Structure formats: structure tokens, C-alpha cells
């Protein structure tokens, strides 16, 4: 029997209080600000966010280096991105994001390659600027078709005061204006990977867009040019988004970072509209282009038919009747397909509950995709969200929904144990914990090696994967050794 809003709110409030009892008083007081239930009239879900995690508790947010190199810069395929510092940061994050791209790896595309300055003790003592210069020389010799280089600083670089900006300027001049971008994304900076996004956006602004030679770019604009910003092509998502935009009559002149190029970044100021997928990681550069170049931007959501329809109409509203009619034509074209998907999977998933804890946009964007299948998200939260992320979340969640910011491992496990959702959607670090608890799980950062999930036809993949996770017969076949 489903609970009323009042009963759900009371249960979740009691659960929050129970979880907080495990902490010392000071810690409990701090964590209480991050845990709540959604109430009507609360414009930001009434939680505190973007605050440093408490030392001593196990939390999930990544660092600023991950936000810059792993999210924003890393997928730019024709640039080489140096993990500047000890080998571990680049090595252990190597190829983990499934940023699909087209190109010849090692020739004109470098996304899945790992470039590191491999700092040793002597580099810490004497500095690594000369080593960085040598690395740039080696890159230019070994990979002559690269279009640019970014220097992604790891923690020691900031601590010892290396001047990566001076090195970048010197080597860029030596190689006749070759784009070399220093990025101050040391992991100790800021609260989470979110500052890494911001730093990376600032680097794009200062070292790419503001340094462009207007005479070099012979790009010919049209009235229907758009740029896809903040789609990282996880499992091919950006390609699916691009197809829909082109089907309604728009011309996609750039998509980045996923399967993106330096030239596309440089073309973006010619767009008539920037369509923004991941608000958290790329709203900064979108706002900059709006202020400097007068390009409006709109956040879109291509997860599930309900949000795709709304987003296509919102995007089309910025153009003339040709594009508006194109949007309606595309919506009608795919209706039979999505109706068939819903008819197949909704009876199997109706009433199933989901708890989410992910980064970026997913804690809110996928909610209506679950709703299209008759499923209900009963708890959600952000790894590195800000106040404006939670403001945007209020439009997606129902009153009584459990909201948790920067949730600790203990809290999340306890919430799942007590609420008993039918599915948990989170990251790789959480996956095996919950599967060992017997809870169906989907990895919602990189789609568990599936996807893409964007677009009408890809909604079928999303529905299949959720059904496969929840209704797999394996849950009835596996028994704990002590129950066998």
C-alpha cells in the first residue's frame, strides 16, 4: 500500500533523525543541513550544498582535477591532455568515462590515451617546469597532428608553485601559436569536482575563446546554427541528441566536450543558440558567451519522451516557424515508437521505486524518464550540487521525496536499507555494496556499459536496462551462504 505525502514525510523525517544519532553532536548538526524531505514552497529543496565534506566520513564527491580533466577537457578528442603531476591521478581515472569519439587514436584523436608528466621526488624538490617543456616538445614530435595541448594540474603543482602559465605561453610562441592551455585544477582546490568545472570553463574562456584570431575562422553561419554544450557523449548520448536537433531542422556546428574538437569550440561563438545538457559543469561558459557574444542558452533534457517533447519545443521556440513545425513533426514521428516501449515495459515496472545519487544533472533529469515507465523516484541527491541545482530539482520531485546532499556511505546504505527501493541508481563505488545487499542497481554515471539513453529511440534501451535490473531472475536464484 502506497503512503500518503504526510506519511512519507513523517517516515523520512524519522529516518533522517535515526541516521543522525550515529554521529557526534557537532557532526550530526552539520549533516542535518544536508538531509531533508521535499516540501511545497521550498524553492531549493531546503538543503545546504557545495560545502566541504566532513573529515572522517566516507563521501563520494571527486576532486577538482576530476572535474576539469575527467569531465570538461578530457573528451576534446584532437587535443592532448597532460595529467601534470604524479602518475596515479591520470592512471586510475584512465578511460573510465566512456566518452565515445570518432577518429584514429594516437593519430588525430587522443581521448583514450594517458599522458602524464610522472612526477618523481626530484621534480617536487627542483620543480617541474623544465620537464613540462620537454614533454610539450615530445608531444609535438610524436603526435604532430594534435590541435592543442592542455596541462591539467594535479595537487603537487599548486603546492610547489610551478609556473605552468609561463611554460604554456613560451611553448605556444615557440610552436607558432599552437594552442596550449594551462588549467589550475589541483585536486585540493574547492569543495568537490565542481570547482574543477568552473576552472576548466575559465580556461576555455581565457585561453581559447578570448585568444581566437577572427581572420583565421572562415566559418559561414546560418540562421539555424546551434551548439551542444556539456554533453560528454557517454555511450554515444551526444550523437543521439545531435540527431534529434538536426531532424527538427537545426544545424549543429559544435558539440563539446563529447566527440568535440578545438575547432568546434572556436566555432561556438557563431551559434544562434547554445543548448546546454549538463548545467552544473558548463553553465559558466554558457553565461560568458551570452554576455560577450549575445548567444542565448537553454538547458535541455532528452531523457524519456515527456522531457524530450518539452525540450524540443523549448529549443524550437527560439527559432522561426520552420523549426517549430519541425519539432512537432519529430514529436509525432516517434510517438508510436515510444508508445510501444511504454506498452511493453510499463506493466513490468509500474509502481517500482527508485533511489538516485549521482552527479551533474542526472539526479533530476532522469526522474521523468522513470515516470514515463510508471516508476517513482523516492529519494535523490547530488554528489557536488549547488543551490541552483536543487532549485531546478523541485520541478521534478514530489512532496515527501527524501533529499540528501553529499550523502555519506553510511547514510545512503541506511536509507536504502529502511526504504527498500526496487532499484538504486548511483556510481561504480556504490554498485557492489548494494548488489551485495540484494538490491538491483544501475550505474547511472556511464550506463553500466550500455546506453545511449538520450533520444526517443534510445528510451527503449533505458527501459530495457531498468527492467533487466529489477526483474532479473538472478535475485531469486542467489542465496546467502548462511541461508543455503
Swiss-Prot record:
The UniProt transmembrane annotation reads none
UniProt keyword Iron present: yes
Q: Which GO terms describe its biological process?
A: nitrogen fixation
**Enzyme Commission number(s) of this protein:** 1.18.6.1
PANTHER family per the record? NITROGENASE MOLYBDENUM-IRON PROTEIN ALPHA CHAIN (PTHR43457:SF1)
Q: Which cofactor does it need?
A: [8Fe-7S] cluster; [7Fe-Mo-9S-C-homocitryl] cluster
Q: How is the cofactor bound?
A: Binds 1 [8Fe-7S] cluster per heterodimer.
Which residues of the sequence carry a binding annotation for [8Fe-7S] cluster? Answer: 63, 89, 155
Among the GO molecular function terms of this UniProt record, one is: nitrogenase activity
In which family does this protein belong, per the annotation? Answer: Belongs to the NifD/NifK/NifE/NifN family.
Annotated keywords: ATP-binding, Iron, Iron-sulfur, Metal-binding, Molybdenum, Nitrogen fixation, Nucleotide-binding, Oxidoreductase
Q: How does it assemble?
A: Tetramer of two alpha and two beta chains. Forms complex with the iron protein (nitrogenase component 2).
Q: Catalyzes what?
A: N2 + 8 reduced [2Fe-2S]-[ferredoxin] + 16 ATP + 16 H2O = H2 + 8 oxidized [2Fe-2S]-[ferredoxin] + 2 NH4(+) + 16 ADP + 16 phosphate + 6 H(+)
Q: Which gene encodes it?
A: nifD
Q: Which species does the entry assign this protein to? A: Herbaspirillum seropedicae
Q: What does this protein do?
A: This molybdenum-iron protein is part of the nitrogenase complex that catalyzes the key enzymatic reactions in nitrogen fixation.
Question: What name does UniProt use for this protein?
Answer: Nitrogenase molybdenum-iron protein alpha chain
| List of residues binding [7Fe-Mo-9S-C-homocitryl] cluster | 278, 445
The cellular component terms of Gene Ontology attached to this UniProt record, alphabetical and capped at eight, are:
molybdenum-iron nitrogenase complex
* Presence of keyword Iron: yes
Amino acid at each position: 500500500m502506497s503512503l500518503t505525502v504526510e506519511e512519507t514525510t513523517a517516515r523520512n523525517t524519522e529516518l533522517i533523525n535515526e541516521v543522525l544519532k550515529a554521529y557526534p553532536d557537532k557532526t550530526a548538526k552539520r549533516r542535518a543541513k544536508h538531509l531533508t524531505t521535499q516540501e511545497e514552497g521550498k524553492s531549493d529543496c531546503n538543503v545546504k550544498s557545495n560545502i566541504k565534506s566532513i573529515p572522517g566520513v566516507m563521501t563520494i564527491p571527486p576532486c577538482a582535477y576530476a572535474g576539469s580533466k575527467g569531465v570538461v577537457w578530457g573528451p576534446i578528442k584532437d587535443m592532448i591532455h597532460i595529467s601534470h603531476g604524479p602518475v596515479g591521478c591520470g592512471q586510475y581515472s584512465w578511460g573510465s568515462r566512456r566518452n565515445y569519439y570518432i577518429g584514429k587514436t594516437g593519430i588525430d584523436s587522443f581521448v583514450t590515451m594517458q599522458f602524464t608528466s610522472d612526477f618523481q621526488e626530484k621534480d617536487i624538490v627542483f620543480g617541474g617546469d623544465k620537464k613540462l617543456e620537454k614533454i610539450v616538445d615530445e608531444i609535438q614530435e610524436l603526435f604532430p597532428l594534435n590541435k592543442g595541448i592542455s596541462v591539467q594540474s594535479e595537487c603537487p603543482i599548486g603546492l610547489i608553485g610551478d609556473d605552468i602559465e609561463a611554460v604554456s605561453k613560451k611553448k605556444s610562441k615557440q610552436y607558432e601559436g599552437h594552442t596550449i592551455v594551462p588549467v589550475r585544477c589541483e585536486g585540493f582546490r574547492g569543495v568537490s569536482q565542481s570547482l574543477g568545472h568552473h576552472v576548466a570553463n575559465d580556461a576555455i574562456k581565457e585561453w581559447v575563446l578570448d585568444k581566437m584570431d577572427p581572420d583565421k575562422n572562415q566559418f559561414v553561419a546560418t540562421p539555424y546554427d546551434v551548439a551542444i554544450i556539456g554533453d560528454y557523449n557517454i555511450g554515444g548520448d551526444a550523437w543521439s541528441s545531435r540527431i534529434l536537433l538536426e531532424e527538427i531542422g537545426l544545424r549543429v556546428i559544435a558539440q563539446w566536450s563529447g566527440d568535440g574538437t578545438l575547432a568546434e569550440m572556436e566555432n561556438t561563438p557563431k551559434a544562434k543558440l547554445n543548448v546546454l545538457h549538463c548545467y552544473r559543469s558548463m553553465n559558466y561558459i554558457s553565461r560568458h558567451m551570452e554576455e560577450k557574444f549575445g548567444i542565448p542558452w537553454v538547458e535541455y533534457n532528452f531523457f524519456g519522451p515527456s522531457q524530450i517533447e518539452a525540450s524540443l519545443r523549448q529549443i524550437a521556440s527560439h527559432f522561426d516557424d520552420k523549426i517549430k513545425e519541425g519539432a512537432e513533426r519529430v514529436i509525432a514521428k516517434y510517438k508510436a515508437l515510444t508508445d510501444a516501449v511504454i506498452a511493453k515495459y510499463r506493466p513490468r515496472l509500474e509502481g517500482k521505486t527508485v533511489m538516485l545519487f549521482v552527479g551533474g544533472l542526472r539526479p533530476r533529469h532522469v526522474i521523468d524518464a522513470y515516470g514515463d515507465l510508471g516508476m517513482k523516484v523516492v529519494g535523490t541527491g547530488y554528489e557536488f550540487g549547488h543551490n541552483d541545482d536543487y532549485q531546478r530539482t523541485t520541478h521534478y520531485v514530489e512532496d515527501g521525496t527524501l533529499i540528501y546532499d553529499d550523502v555519506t556511505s553510511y547514510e545512503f546504505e541506511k536509507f536504502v536499507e529502511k526504504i527498500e527501493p526496487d532499484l538504486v541508481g548511483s556510481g561504480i563505488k556504490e554498485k557492489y555494496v548494494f548488489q551485495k545487499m540484494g538490491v538491483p542497481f544501475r550505474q547511472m554515471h556511464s550506463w553500466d556499459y550500455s546506453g545511449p539513453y538520450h533520444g526517443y529511440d534510445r528510451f527503449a534501451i533505458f527501459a530495457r536496462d531498468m527492467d533487466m535490473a529489477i526483474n532479473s531472475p538472478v535475485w531469486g536464484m542467489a542465496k546467502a551462504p548462511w541461508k543455503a
